Amino acid sequence: MSAGFRLIDLETWPRREHYEAYFKNTPCTWSMTVQLDVTGLVKQGAKLYPALLYACGKVANRHEEFRMSLDEAGRPGVWDELHTSYTVFHKDTETFSCLWTPYYEDPAEYFAAYQHDLALGRGGGL
């Protein structure tokens, strides 16, 4: 697991013109929706939510474009690795907590870390 953030050199970045056009002139956001067949996961008895968290983490970590962000000074850069963030609802107080689980390439390692973090989050241990 790493937490490195590498600044992008705007002077040499081939996508600078596109970045500036959208960041300065046409600020926007985007979202994506796809149909996804999860039959295999259901047949295996996998828990859908952590499986989807893992899949999103895997895809995001494959593509530099999904790991881009701005630093405190507003300069663009790329994270070496992203980790998953999700919420857990507390029925007794009708509140929720935001949890973070480190991304692991190995699904079994990720799911074990997720279960650990979820148990801590549900018990108020985080």
Positions of PLM-derived features:
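Generic structural hydrophobic/aromatic packing signal, biased to beta-strands
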Residues: 32-34, 41, 84-88, 101, ...
